[in-house]
From Swiss-Prot:
EC number(s) per entry: 3.4.11.4
List of catalytic residues: D80, E173
GO (cellular component) term, any one: cytosol
Chief location category: cytoplasm
Function: Cleaves the N-terminal amino acid of tripeptides.
Lineage: Bacteria, Pseudomonadati, Pseudomonadota, Gammaproteobacteria, Enterobacterales
Record text on cofactor binding: Binds 2 Zn(2+) ions per subunit.
InterPro entries in the record: ArgE/DapE_CS, Bact_exopeptidase_dim_dom, Peptidase_M20, Peptidase_M20_dimer, Peptidase_M20B
CDD domains, sorted: M20_peptT
UniProt-recorded name of the protein: Peptidase T
Family: Belongs to the peptidase M20B family.
Entry's localization field: Cytoplasm
Length: 409
């Protein structure tokens, strides 16, 4: 596991936060810095067919070291970090041999507590890498990046049989654009794994169907003293819309396979208001029903408005549940599960209450379930990763490569 932690700490030192609402891909210059660094490291490692596209997708190949009809497989991670929390001047803390209890994050009042995050009870004796309470850590997904790079080094430096190993590093995954410019044909893998999961053992092949809902409300503002019968308050209409959305079907009230409506932002004045929702559901029929529900609500609240006042609703699908594509190729999951068991890890098949690049790639002809990274509490100041979890991820990647080679020989 030479240089695994060193690589990770180097990668998180670079601010690669992506930005939503930007046309260019990658959306931020910082992502280019990490992509160019990785390209240089791949070249130094001796990989071939290294390309960095104008849209920031970095691809490379570790050639097979054995003969046979061995399928080419891929491993993919994203270089950007979430726009939800600052990724600038990340200052990681290394807690060796965690003994339990609260971990102070920096010099302020912030702590990482097992009361709020009970998973810490399972990590006694391990080495934790945390934030200083001022930024996110960036384990999502620089842990995955470091693990893939380290696995390549292990495969390159040891006589472990493997076929062609394709790797890719993508930008803007956190803003939903990571896979849009991914050339599956150029990548050349029969299947792949994103390394973008959470705790040790996670193996995910089901994710939400996802859509965004943007609502524009145009009202009419006049002096409140003479407003009767004339004023149309856009903010009041927004409140009425949200009151119609099922309150018990929100992120904070759902879990497992339950879907939700999430009001992500709302702004406005009496004259004009905007609302942004996201819709999520694992079941395609329920997903379509949720979209219809939003349209019905907008129609109901907007009924009888003055012609100059209106509610405009735009729904855009973001990605779909990759399950229907991955289950067509059960050996992809079988190999990953066997690799975990061979590394003394119990596979934990669970749905992703979110999405990955792999969801989009699966519908582009590259079946792509998701492997764990050893990270927790993504997108915020309580994010952390365990060194042991990262080492396990490297072992699983290497073992997947070895098992795939055995199938083809």
């Amino acid at each position: 596991m030479d240089k695994l932690l060193e690589r990770f700490l180097h990668y998180v030192s670079l601010d690669t936060q992506s930005k939503s609402g930007v046309r260019q891909v990658p959306s931020t210059e910082g992502q280019w810095k990490l992509l160019r660094l990785l390209k240089q490291q791949l070249e130094e490692m001796g990989l071939v067919n290294i390309t960095l596209s104008e849209k920031g997708t970095l691809m490379a190949t570790l050639p097979a070291n054995v003969e046979g009809d061995i399928p080419a497989i891929g491993f993919i991670s994203h270089v950007d970090t979430s726009p939800d929390f600052s990724g600038k001047n990340v200052n990681p803390q290394i807690v060796e041999n965690y003994r339990g209890g609260d971990i102070a994050l920096g010099i302020g009042d912030e702590v990482l507590s097992p009361v709020m995050f009970p998973v810490l009870h399972q990590l006694l004796g391990q080495t934790l890498v945390t934030t200083d309470g001022k930024t996110l850590l960036g384990a999502d997904d620089k842990a995955g990046v470091a693990e893939i790079m380290t696995a390549l080094a292990v495969l390159k430096g040891n006589p472990i049989p493997h076929g062609d190993i394709k790797v890719a590093f993508t930008p803007d995954e956190e803003v939903g654009k990571g896979a849009k410019h991914f050339d599956v044909e150029e990548f050349g893998a029969q299947w792949a794994y994103t390394v973008d999961g959470g705790g040790v053992g996670e193996l995910e092949f089901e994710n939400f169907n996802a859509a965004s809902v943007n609502i524009k409300i145009v009202g009419n503002n006049v002096h409140p003293g003479t407003a009767k019968g004339v004023m149309v308050n856009a903010l009041s209409l927004a409140a009425r819309i949200h009151a119609e959305v099922p309150a018990d079907e929100a992120p904070e009230t759902t879990e497992g396979y339950e879907g939700f409506y999430h009001l992500a932002s709302m702004k406005g004045t009496v004259d004009r208001a905007e609302m942004h929702y996201i819709i999520r559901d694992f079941d395609r029929k329920q997903f379509e029903a949720r979209k219809r529900k939003m349209m019905e609500i907008a129609k109901k609240v907007g009924k009888g408005l003055h012609p100059d006042c209106y509610i405009e609703l735009v729904i855009e699908d973001s990605y779909y549940n990759m399950r229907e594509k991955v289950v067509e190729h059960p050996h992809i999951l079988d190999i990953a599960q066997q690799a975990m068991r061979d590394c003394h890890i119990t596979p934990e098949m669970k749905p992703i209450r979110g999405g990955t690049d792999g969801a989009q790639l699966s519908f582009m002809g590259l079946p792509c379930p998701n492997l764990f990274t050893g990270g927790y509490n993504y997108h915020g100041k309580h994010e952390f990763v365990t060194l042991e979890g990262m080492e396990k991820a490297v072992q699983v990647i290497v073992r997947i490569a070895e098992l795939t080679a055995k199938r083809g020989q």
